[in-house]
Regions:
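Low-complexity, charge- and small-residue-enriched intrinsically disordered regions
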Residues: 4-6, 85, 152-153
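Nucleotide-activated donor-dependent transferases that construct or modify glycoconjugates
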Residues: 4-16, 197-200
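Active-site and donor-binding regions of nucleotide-sugar-utilizing enzymes
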Residues: 11-150
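Nucleotide donor/acceptor-binding cores
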Residues: 7-8, 87, 193
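Extended hydrophobic/Leu-rich segments
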Residues: 39, 82, 86-88, 112, ...
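Conserved catalytic-core segment of nucleotide-activated headgroup transferases in glycan assembly
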Residues: 194-224
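Short boundary motifs at domain starts and secondary-structure transition points
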Residues: 1-5, 27-29, 78-81, 183-191
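A nucleotide-sugar donor-handling region in carbohydrate enzymes
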Residues: 117-118, 123-126, 130-204
């Protein structure tokens, strides 16, 4: 159910630089030129928005900034020409209630929603039910319930993931992201001596670890 390259009814919703890179890889690997790129932001002073915009600039991609810090900011979309417009949507993060709410509004009946890679969050997302509810705040809870209602009403398809993780699950459709198109002709940086620390939500890795490695990971958490 992934997007066919000849279809031009595509919207992209992202909030972070990494999500932007995944979206660019999707566009290039599928040779898609007709789309609308929405950069979602919750404030006027958003560092993530600034970096994401710089990344899009490197690839000469036009984008529209959408600032929806409050729940009521989404309601004008319901009466706009964007409502029910797109048959296909790339959504940066399965767990982002704001992205899901926007996708549920601008998506058409039976719209195909493909979730882009958001690191270890993708592993958690694949395990979750399609209509995930975020309870970290009242606003996000309402966003989740509202988007879940629209997704069900419109019978949207929410089981597509574009990820670099190897994961076999009959409930979802997974397309491999190897970043091969994003990396083409990019300048390489020579390796330098030093220590590189990559932060991650280690709980998401438990699914891939055997008992011995899980214990080692737990001990690492305790002493770090």
């Amino acid at each position: 159910m992934f997007l066919r390259k000849e279809n031009n009814e595509l919207a992209i919703i992202c909030r972070s630089p990494f999500q932007v890179l995944c979206a660019i890889e999707y566009l290039r690997s599928n040779i898609i030129e007709d789309y609308t790129f929405y950069l979602l932001s919750f404030s006027n002073d958003d560092k993530s928005e600034e970096i994401s915009a710089n990344v899009l600039g490197l690839y000469n991609i036009d984008y529209i900034v959408c600032r929806y810090p409050k729940l009521k900011d989404y309601f004008p979309l319901l009466k706009s020409e964007l409502c029910n417009k797109y048959n296909y949507i790339l959504c940066g993060n399965f767990f982002d209630a704001g992205q899901r709410m926007m996708a549920s509004i601008i998506g058409s009946n039976r719209a195909v929603i493909t979730f882009l890679d958001d690191g270890n969050q993708t592993i958690n997302a694949i395990k979750q039910k399609s209509y995930y509810v975020t309870f970290d705040s009242v606003t996000n809870t309402l966003r989740s319930l509202f988007s879940g209602f629209l997704f069900i009403k419109k019978k949207c398809l929410l089981n597509n993931f574009f990820t670099f993780f190897e994961y076999e699950d009959l409930r979802v459709n997974i397309k491999k992201n190897d970043f091969s198109h994003v990396l083409i002709n990019r300048n390489k940086i020579n390796e330098k001596d030093g220590i590189y620390i990559i932060g991650t939500n280690s709980r998401s890795l438990n699914h891939f670890l055997d008992e011995k490695n899980s214990v080692e990971l737990h001990l690492t958490r305790l002493i770090s």
